[in-house]
Amino acid sequence: MNNIILQVENLEKKFELYLPEKKVFFAFQNINFNLYQGEFFSISGPSGSGKSSLLKCLYRTYKTTKGSIFYRSSRYGIVDFTKLQEQSVLNIRSNEMSYVSQFLNVIPRISALNLVAEPLIRKNIPQGIAIERAKEMLSRLNIPTNLFDSSPLTFSGGEKQRVNIARAVIWNPSLLLLDEPTASLDEKSEKIVKKILVTMKKSGSTLIGIFHNKKLINQISDRVFLFRKEE
């Protein structure tokens, strides 16, 4: 795979619903692309075309119906993510791959500060250092200091998303998946996030993301993959 970090081959995801009769529909079919080390790869396309479902398959939140996702892991070598044992998937998520979803799901009792520091602590960074780095990241993303000890469940949509981003990027994962990370952000916050993502790319991280802002796509992307809605 040389400098290819992710290779997607003939990927398909279908859903089956019973309403009450069985109905089958495809989120996407026959998806093929390579993702190169250090690349910023954007996915664009109309709403409902299956973009978010694709990212969920890449992260193994969803299991695919057909096809392969070959991932070059620093721990396991080249593996087919669609066939990998669950424990190995969890290890890769903890040590190599991060994901910014559209929605932040957290345990109510956990503060924003501890939530953002947790990935560093998991990687054996001393707790005190992890907390300080989390404070710096939250401040950089304009989260008020008086909210650090509060649960993100009480935050606005934009604040929740910035905490979500902070948690995903603070440990500089090898591969970062982004599902519309700037959709709920104002222009100022979007510019800050853009700078963080560009810095990550320069430091060697590989990024694949869904964006609807065409100007932003043109500014940050090395390549753009156009999704078409399945009929």
Language model features: what each stretch is:
Residues I129-N146:
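Conserved ABC ATPase "signature" region
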Residues S151-F155, E159:
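Conserved ABC ATPase signature
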Residues A168-V169:
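ABC ATPase C-loop
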Residues I110-E118:
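Short coil-to-helix segment of the ABC ATPase nucleotide-binding domain corresponding to the Q-loop/switch region
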Residues N172:
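Conserved catalytic motifs of ABC-family nucleotide-binding domains
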Residues S68-N91:
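ABC ATPase NBD Q-loop/coupling interface
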Residues L176-D179:
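Catalytic Walker B motif of ABC-type/P-loop ATPase nucleotide-binding domains
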Residues Y59:
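Helix-to-loop junction immediately C-terminal to a conserved catalytic motif
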